[in-house]
């Protein structure tokens, strides 16, 4: 009942005046994440609030990946009394869905160092400094990045060379139709979306031409509101675009040295991220999840470690009562266990990768269809390993 009353206050009086203290929420875990991870935070936040075995409240704010890295490396607190986001439980709001707004709570008056920080690309793209001994890094799902255009645009593809001249030289690049720098919508230099694209088209992040936006929603608004749709182009996380396919299109990208342009998915309308998983689409990064550890390397906050292990696709104790892989797939990310290529730095060369516990068959069944054989205790696999009802490679 207490949280039903607090929820009513939060809904009735927006802003800090009506925000309940975050510390009063059930088992709060504080996160600072990239805005490309908002959809994951909302879905996972709901599931963890209602996770009977271990209820957790994800309390989060969004910021650029480079800012997030510095925040946890330096143990810098989130400002005291800052408004943070969280998701209601089923008991608090049964009608809430991942498309609904988050709720607001107020950070502790003395501030709070994030329990978890997220970078949506290799940390080395932001800093050459190694993590301090008090911070550990875990690789999570893979994040693709796209070049988006308004639905009214007739453009369908772009090459490495064209992107280099468009974003490196703007109007002087003379790449039709992308010559109007006021119609080129990019991000600020701490954001993974810009840094990932910068590494993939060889244009330093601070040299890009275009209108710099702090958040993905601003890029989306600029694209959808453009009065010059043929000239408009912007950079987004693929999972941001996946939720806006009715209003935006993306460009197939031909990377340097390639002979054809590819979408992240096998077609412009599918959601299978096949070309990301097999290396044909090259603009992607791993998500990195950071937590604080003690002098012995043990998590300072075990429940934060629990959350990170979930996101990374690992088994946790106690077991969850929802399907984490299905959640990751639903927001447009790719579980590491479904990837078949890897790289070691942003924009680096790709090499073949075989996950220790493959989940390709299950992932494909979630986002499209799979040709994999099914299995059960009474119907074992003729080859491979039976996992989640499918015969995986290993």
Task: State what each model feature region is.
Residues 1-4:
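Positively charged n-region of N-terminal signal peptides that target proteins for export
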Residues 19-394:
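Flexible loop/hinge segments at secondary-structure junctions
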Residues 14-16:
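N-terminal signal peptide c-region/cleavage motif recognized by signal peptidases
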